[in-house]
Amino acid sequence: MLRKAIADIQAKYVRKDVPELRSGDSVRVHTKIKEGDKERIQVFEGVVIAYRRGTPGSSMFTVRKMSYGVGVERMFPVHSPRIDRIEVTGHGEVRRSRLYYLRGLQGKAARLHQEEGPSSAAPASTPPAAAPQA
């Protein structure tokens, strides 16, 4: 009985605009920051190193970025009202669901190989046929 009541309350706060996230994705998380009486949007850009799925109230993902040579990790509740939006900017090719090994890597070794997707480049158009010279 209590579980159903909790599930009903959580269902009201579930976000519908959450993109499909996976470990290795490059994301930009736009969060609402309140400073005094003003509110602004702050962007945190990095790689998803862990995604814990569960009930809507408990699902979270961890994003890691390098800031001036220091690794910064931040955990975000997926359905938080403080998150304005989540943009997926790329998909890394990984074979693990938790990428905690990236913590021990530095420089180019910490980069992930980006998945090859459909080419976004437009096909080359053929040049117009030249008029016959008379």
UniProtKB/Swiss-Prot annotation:
Entry-linked InterPro entries: Ribosomal_bL19, Ribosomal_bL19_sf, Translation_prot_SH3-like_sf
Signal peptide: none
Ranges of compositional bias, category Pro residues: 125-134
Highest taxon of source: Bacteria
Record key words, sorted: Ribonucleoprotein, Ribosomal protein
Molecular function GO terms recorded: structural constituent of ribosome
Gene3D superfamilies: 2.30.30.790
Chain segments carrying region Disordered: 110-134
Pfam family, one: Ribosomal_L19
Transferase among keywords: no
GO process terms (BP): translation
GO cellular component terms listed in the entry, alphabetical order: cytosolic large ribosomal subunit
Family from the record: Belongs to the bacterial ribosomal protein bL19 family.
Function: This protein is located at the 30S-50S ribosomal subunit interface and may play a role in the structure and function of the aminoacyl-tRNA binding site.
PANTHER family found in the cross-reference section: LARGE RIBOSOMAL SUBUNIT PROTEIN BL19M, RIBOSOMAL PROTEIN L19
Name listed for the protein in its UniProt record: Large ribosomal subunit protein bL19
Organism whose genome encodes this protein: Anaeromyxobacter sp. (strain Fw109-5)
Lineage: Bacteria, Pseudomonadati, Myxococcota, Myxococcia, Myxococcales
